[in-house]
Amino acid sequence: MNLYDTHTMKRGAILVDVCGYTGEEDFYAMHKIIDEVIKPEDSGFSVDSMCIGGYFNKDGILVRTSSESPYDGLSFFYEPAKMSAEDVKKIEDWIETVVKELHDRLPR
């Protein structure tokens, strides 16, 4: 099983689905890892009746997070067209780090 699947949307935005993790508790665990390991300057999330939407901002780079995706799993979302190649690489590395840590802490 892949740790995550990456999808390019019609306008070039990237959606990264975290394989095997869904719902609120997994989302909270993911955000705890983001705060502890990535150490963003700012992060947060809000809960409504449909999903949890969140974000983190590090080095001036915004990455959005969600518990809602095509498969109702955890996801990351970012727009590489508005970023340098170096910033895109940072995001890819952050996602890889968070997802590996999530699998280590909550194996499935």
Model-flagged regions — what are they?
Residues 12-21, 54-57, 76-78:
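Generic recognition of long tandem-repeat/solenoid scaffolds
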Residues 41-43, 50-56, 78, 99-106:
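Low-complexity, flexible helical/coil segments
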Residues 82-108:
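Mixed-charge, Lys/Arg-enriched low-complexity segments
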